[in-house]
Amino acid sequence: MNKYLILCVDDEPEVLNSVLQDLAPFEDNFIVEGAESVDEAKQVIQEMGQEGIKLALILCDHIMPDKTGIDFLIELNQHDSTMPTRKLLLTGQAGLEDTVTAINNAALDFYISKPWQGDQLRDTITQQLTDYVIANDKQLLNWTSILDTERILTSMSDKRTSFGE
């Protein structure tokens, strides 16, 4: 089974630790990493990429000192290796204009406002990771016990049906 990376980026250590704690259940099947800056996030992505580990999902704060989360997500969307990545914005400070920019230019997949509920965050991450593996992994059967079983089996059935046509 392919290993994929979930990366959380937030410049506030308490927030980052809280998000990582909420995502701990994913650690059995994904590599879950945190970064306190865009530069640190880029380093993690590069190091994991050198090991053949793809970035499946990034959960990024918007307001950070060196670069906004939206600008970083736009940058990721411009590279072939990270374009398929599911991109989530976790913030309490993005205005309407920033959010529209993220949707239009960064292919934002989901917006989560702070404060968040742990169960809702995990459900959202599960759905986004399901979307990612359906689109990017050929061995879907491996994921049926981990992610959204019904959607994965439906996708497998649809692929078999379209292959036979």
Show where each model-derived region lies:
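Active-site residues of response regulator receiver
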Residues: 10, 61, 91
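A Lys-centered signature of the CheY-like receiver
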Residues: 113-114
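Alpha4 helix (beta4-alpha4-beta5 surface) of REC/receiver domains from two-component response regulators
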Residues: 71, 94-110
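Two-component/phosphorelay signaling modules centered on CheY-like receiver
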Residues: 4, 13-37, 80
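CheY-like receiver
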Residues: 120-165
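Receiver (REC) domain active-site loop signature in two-component systems and cognate sites
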Residues: 64-65
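Active-site beta3 strand of CheY-like receiver
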Residues: 49-59
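Helix N-cap/capping motif at the beta->alpha junctions
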Residues: 20, 34-47, 69
